[in-house]
Amino acid sequence: HKSAKVNSIRTRNLIEQCDIAVVRFGEKYKQWNAAFDAGYASALGKPVVTLHDEALTHALKEVDGAAAAVAQTPEQVVRILGYAINGKL
């Protein structure tokens, strides 16, 4: 558990420094950690982009509701970030 605590310090620090938080949910990702990170970023006023399969849409409806954008593929995230940063799709 010590490494998890150290990692949480790093994660919190990176979220505090970010301009936009991209939070990925999926089979290989711990849902509760991702949900916590999304909530923390949102509480700090950071725009959140969620990334997850369509199968998780209902389960993540509250998280997606608080997100600035929702994506189902990494390519969609790239397009969202490109628009947010450069104003181009």
Task: List each model region and its residues.
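Conserved catalytic or regulatory cores that recognize and/or transform ribose-phosphate-containing ligands
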Residues: 1-89
